[in-house]
Structure formats: structure tokens, C-alpha cells
A protein has these predicted regions:
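N-terminal transmembrane alpha-helices
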Residues: 6-37, 41-42, 55-74, 99-106, ...
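Interfacial/gating helices of multi-pass transporter permease domains
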Residues: 39-58, 124-131, 192-193, 234-242, ...
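Short runs within selected transmembrane alpha-helices of multi-pass transporters and secretion channels
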Residues: 68, 72, 136-154, 162-170, ...
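Alpha-helical transmembrane segments and their lipid-water interface positions
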Residues: 28, 32-35, 39, 61-68, ...
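Short alpha-helical transmembrane segments in multi-pass integral membrane proteins
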Residues: 1-21, 75-141, 187-244, 300-368, ...
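Helix-terminus/linker motif at the lipid-water interface of multi-pass membrane proteins
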Residues: 30-48, 116-123, 179-190, 251-278, ...
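Small-residue-rich hydrophobic transmembrane alpha-helices
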Residues: 47-110, 143-157, 161-162, 275-336, ...
């Protein structure tokens, strides 16, 4: 029973780190939610295009974001080991990586735009998707640099800085998006392009706030910022050794999800709009839990650096209590209120009944897997913080791509219909969560030898 007893101190620390990150990620979810709501006021096609274009742009960025965001765990490990001067050096190595990543991202984005036509999307949907996608890719370098600083502040447990920067960015984004979409307050009416431009401007604004925190005098003195602006091959080697598997996992998983979404949207406008509606609510549940995931990575990394495995176990238990408690409430709401939640995004039109019927069915599936999502984020945070990124990469990627192959036969070969495809998607998430829990219960990732390899800079 002692193993399952949760210490108040650990829970308090987790919540103090997680709360600002949940607010930050929640603000991001609100931004996406309002963007798509504004699009739905124009037409279901515009809303579907914002989903397809947004997911495709994140797909292109995901490899680089996955690598750069591992700064959270690296910084936390150095912070726990009391090597504060190395924390800011992690940021410098991340910025060095950005010099190569940004041109590569622009090239990848240029060729990725053709996927919309290859997947057989309706011409009117494809045109809007490409407009939204290419503008987001143009400003994607800002997002990569912002990831370095956000991950750093999470690693040193200064998540209030992340909350302030991201929340103020969203406060700017929402009215700016409305103005640039509909052409009010002296702005031109740009439609879906206006939403993309507003996203870039607000990201740049958030980055400026991060820079102000980073170069603040007391912070510069404590973490030796002025002495950190050098190439450190040892830290860079750790960054790539542990971060690349994390980036590859994110890239291939997002690729699999993106291809599934593109195939699902090829059913037609009703199915594309229904997917957009349900994933809007998925974001509301999933994105705030990413804040919990970030906090768990930070705390586990710190206790790995301190070599304090007892406190690490407490983080695991506390994370499960928070994650499953939050997601269980959402699961009940998604079932009980599925019809009014869907109706928010459905305007009167020729496809209204079809969109309502399919979306309500899909909301039940969302309620089914929301607790599995919480499990994935808690366990994934623990394993990433402990440096078990290779296992995560192999298992997660294999399961996602196996699902994609199954979906190809369901959607394209046997033409079994959108409800069957959605059930397959839900089952895949449940199976992945079960595999993660089995790994967490094992011993291989937390042996002294494994943890020593994680901390080594050679």
C-alpha cells in the first residue's frame, strides 16, 4: 500500500508546474477552436479546410518540433543534477539545430502541398487547404524557435513564463483572426488566409515575450546565459541521441494520422465536416492534457538527474490521478451532451442532417478513447523524461502505421464506410495505451545502467 500512497508534496509540485502548462495548452486549444468556429461561419468546406491544412502543416513541422521539444527533459535532467550552466546551453544547441531545420522545413512543405490533390479531395476543399497550409509553412520557423524557449522554461519548472507568453499570444490571435477573416477594423477581408496570417503574427508576439523572460537580468546571471552562446558537442550529442527518436516518432505518427484524416475526408464533405467537428472537441480534451505531459517530463527528468527514483514513482501516481480524473469527467460530458456539442458547429444547409448524425456517432467514440489518451500522455511523459525514447519510437510508430494499413483496406479497398473506419481508429488508441502501460510496469527502462546511459554525454 505504501507504493500506491501519493505524497502531498509531489502532487503539489506537479500541479504547480502543470497548471500553467494546462492553461497554456488550453489557450492554444481555444485558439484552434475559435479559428475553426470562425471558418464554420463561412461554410463547412472552410472549416474542413482549416483542419486539413492545419494538420498537414503540423505534419511537416512535427519531426523538428519533436526533436527540439526534448529540450524539456534535457534541461530538467541538468537542473536536477545542479548543473545550471548547462541548462541554457541546451537552448543554444536547439537554436543551432534550427539553422538547419528551417530551410529543410520549407522544402518539405513545398512538396507536401500536392497531397491534397493526390488524396482526391473536392476541388473547392483543395484550393482552401493549400492556401491555409502554405501560409502556415511560410511562418513555421517562428514556431520552431519558440519551441526551444518554451521547452527550456518547462525544464527549469518556470512554466508561468510559458503560460504568460502563450496566453497573451492567443489574446492577440482571436480578435486579429476575426478581423482578418471578415475584414473589420480596417483590415482587408482575407477569409481562410487571414486566419493563417493571424496565427503567424501571434506566434511572433509570443516569441518576443519568451525572449524578454530569457534575457531578463536575474535569469541571465543565475543560468549564465551570456556564457551559453557556444557550440557544446557533448550536449548537442545528447540532444540528437535522445531527441531524434522522439522527433521521428512524432513525425511518423503525425504522418499516419494525417494520411488517415486525408483518407477519411475523401469519403465526402459530410465526413470531412464531421471529422473537423469531433476533432475540435478532441483538441479541447487532449491539448490541455499535453500540459500535464510536459510537467511530468520535467519532473521525471529532474528526479532522474537527482537519482531519486522514489520521487519519480510519486510523479507517476500523481500524473495518473490527475489525468484519469480529468478525462473521465470529459468522457461523461461527451456522451451526455454529444448532440448540443455537435450542433455548435453545424449551420443550416443541405448536409446538416448527415453531419449531425455522423458527428454524434463519432462523439461516442471520442468519449471511449479520451481516458486512453490520458494514459498515453502520462506514461509517455514518464518514459520520455527517463530517456526511453527509442522504445517509444518503435512501438508507437509500428502501431500507428499498422492502423493506417488497416484503414486503407477499410476505406479504399473494402469501402466499409466512415463508421467502421472510426471504430478502427478508436480501437488502435486503446491498444496503444495498453502497450504503454505494460512498458511502464517493466524494469528495463529504469535500471541504473539504462539511466546512466541516458545521462552520458558521449
Amino acid at each position: 500500500m505504501k507504493y500506491f500512497k501519493i505524497e502531498k508534496e509531489t502532487m503539489s509540485q506537479l500541479l504547480s508546474i502543470a497548471y500553467p502548462m494546462v492553461v497554456s495548452q488550453g489557450a492554444f486549444a481555444v485558439m484552434i477552436f475559435t479559428d475553426r468556429y470562425f471558418m464554420s461561419l463561412i461554410s463547412p468546406t472552410h472549416m474542413a479546410a482549416s483542419l486539413g491544412g492545419g494538420v498537414a502543416s503540423f505534419f511537416c513541422m512535427s519531426l523538428f518540433i519533436g526533436i527540439l521539444s526534448y529540450a524539456n527533459a534535457l534541461v530538467a535532467q541538468y537542473y536536477g543534477a545542479k548543473e545550471l550552466e548547462k541548462c541554457t546551453r541546451v537552448v543554444t544547441q536547439g537554436l543551432i539545430l534550427c539553422v538547419g531545420f528551417i530551410p529543410s522545413l520549407l522544402i518539405i512543405g513545398y512538396f507536401t502541398g500536392s497531397l491534397f490533390s493526390i488524396m482526391g479531395h473536392a476541388p473547392e476543399l483543395e484550393i482552401l487547404e493549400k492556401k491555409y497550409f502554405y501560409i502556415l509553412i511560410f511562418g513555421s520557423g517562428i514556431g520552431l524557435i519558440k519551441t526551444c524557449f518554451a521547452s527550456y522554461f518547462a525544464g527549469i519548472a518556470k512554466t508561468r513564463a510559458v503560460m504568460i507568453a502563450d496566453t497573451l499570444g492567443v489574446v492577440l490571435n482571436i480578435p486579429l483572426t476575426y478581423a482578418m477573416i471578415f475584414g473589420v477594423w480596417q483590415f482587408p477581408e482575407l477569409g481562410i488566409e487571414g486566419a493563417a496570417y493571424a496565427t503567424i503574427v501571434s506566434s511572433l508576439f509570443s516569441l518576443c515575450i519568451f525572449l524578454a523572460f530569457y534575457f531578463q537580468r536575474l535569469h541571465r546571471q543565475r543560468y549564465l546565459v551570456d556564457q551559453s552562446l557556444v557550440l557544446d558537442k557533448g550536449i548537442l550529442g545528447r540532444y540528437l541521441r535522445l531527441g531524434v527518436p522522439s522527433g521521428v516518432e512524432m513525425f511518423l505518427n503525425v504522418a499516419a494520422f494525417n494520411l488517415f484524416l486525408l483518407m477519411y475526408q475523401s469519403y465526402g464533405v459530410i465526413e470531412a465536416a464531421s471529422a473537423a467537428i469531433v476533432f475540435n472537441w478532441d483538441i479541447v480534451s487532449f491539448v490541455p492534457m499535453i500540459g500535464l505531459n510536459v510537467a511530468i517530463i520535467s519532473m521525471v527528468g529532474r528526479f532522474i538527474g537527482e537519482n531519486n527514483l522514489d520521487r519519480m514513482r510519486q510523479v507517476v501516481l500523481s500524473g495518473f490521478l490527475v489525468g484519469l480524473g480529468y478525462s473521465s469527467i470529459l468522457a461523461i460530458l461527451f456522451v451526455a451532451l454529444r448532440e448540443p456539442l455537435v450542433a455548435i458547429f453545424v449551420a443550416d444547409g443541405p448536409n446538416t442532417d448527415g453531419i449531425m448524425e455522423l458527428s454524434i456517432f463519432m462523439m461516442v467514440g471520442l468519449a471511449t478513447y479520451v481516458m486512453a489518451d490520458a494514459t498515453l500522455l502520462v506514461v509517455g511523459g514518464v518514459l520520455r523524461g527517463a530517456g526511453d525514447t527509442r522504445w517509444l519510437m518503435w512501438v508507437s510508430v509500428l502501431l500507428h502505421w499498422f492502423m493506417l494499413i488497416v484503414q486503407y483496406f477499410v476505406i479504399k479497398v473494402f469501402e466499409l464506410g466512415p463508421k467502421t473506419a472510426w471504430v478502427v481508429f478508436v480501437v488502435m488508441i486503446l491498444i496503444t495505451a495498453a502497450c504503454y502501460v505494460l512498458r511502464l510496469r517493466g524494469e528495463k527502462w529504469r535500471t541504473p545502467e539504462a539511466l546512466a546511459r541516458v545521462m552520458a554525454e558521449q
